[in-house]
Amino acid sequence: MTDVRRVFFVSDRTGITAEALGHSLMTQFSVTTEQATIPFVDTAERARAALRRITAASAEDDHPPIVFSTIIDPEVLAVLRESEHIVLFDFFDTFIAPLERELEVPSNHVIGRSHGIADDSTYDVRIDAMNFALHHDDGATHQHYGRADVILVGVSRSGKTPASLYLALQFGVYAANYPLTDDDLIATRLPRALVSHRAKLFGLTIDPDRLHQIRSERRPNSRYAELRQCEYEVARAEAMFRREGIPYLDITTMSIEEISSTVIHQHALTRRV
């Protein structure tokens, strides 16, 4: 027997939607969970296989497994509905029917539309923004900063790269990022590469203790990871942000999604997708 509650995200496509919604709901409860995603459950046979996997994994548990579903096909979903061994939460059943009544229009019941290539132009924007973020990651090149919607600035390991990539993929934002070096932190002026793009700058900072922990995992017992060095770099970076009037955000306890959404909001960026 176990106190851990098993949670499964079951979908007829990638499972991203079921996972995102289900995880958001579960974070509202102080319970220990073991989570798993079962994607591409698009036939009754696959649904039965998924059900066998779920019930087998939970056979010794005190409570039935919780299953979040975004399956569209009624026949496939029926396999899960008929089971007495799971607690099923179907997102589409919860929201689609009320929306159909409100909008007075039947839904299309199209599988995978939220994460498929429904619009070629949107897909192209995401790919172009991703390429831009990759080419302008970690100060690799400053050549096309003029195209950037935002340039994230901060010390090493302060979340710049994942935030840049998420902004590109999720919102189609052209995000570059610039790492503050020792020379940049010693100087009393803005780095030369950033001077003409001041309006696009957005700073990311982090608690020195957390930075020390992250860097120690990457380079243990190095000067780079020393707490004193982390404290110095964070203090100098924040002093630069204040001196130069650069808006900045403490990302210590924030997820990548929260960081990106906050940058969008505070910097008044226009999302392309």
Curated annotation (Swiss-Prot):
Q: Does the keyword Kinase apply?
A: yes
Binding site residues for ADP: 154-161
Recorded catalytic reaction(s): these are: [pyruvate, water dikinase] + ADP = [pyruvate, water dikinase]-phosphate + AMP + H(+); [pyruvate, water dikinase]-phosphate + phosphate + H(+) = [pyruvate, water dikinase] + diphosphate
Q: What is its EC number?
A: 2.7.11.33, 2.7.4.28
- Keyword Nucleotide-binding set for record: yes
**Function, please?**
Bifunctional serine/threonine kinase and phosphorylase involved in the regulation of the phosphoenolpyruvate synthase (PEPS) by catalyzing its phosphorylation/dephosphorylation.
PANTHER family in the record: PYRUVATE, PHOSPHATE DIKINASE REGULATORY PROTEIN 1, CHLOROPLASTIC
Q: What is this protein called?
A: Putative phosphoenolpyruvate synthase regulatory protein
Q: Which organism is it from?
A: Halorhodospira halophila (strain DSM 244 / SL1) (Ectothiorhodospira halophila (strain DSM 244 / SL1))
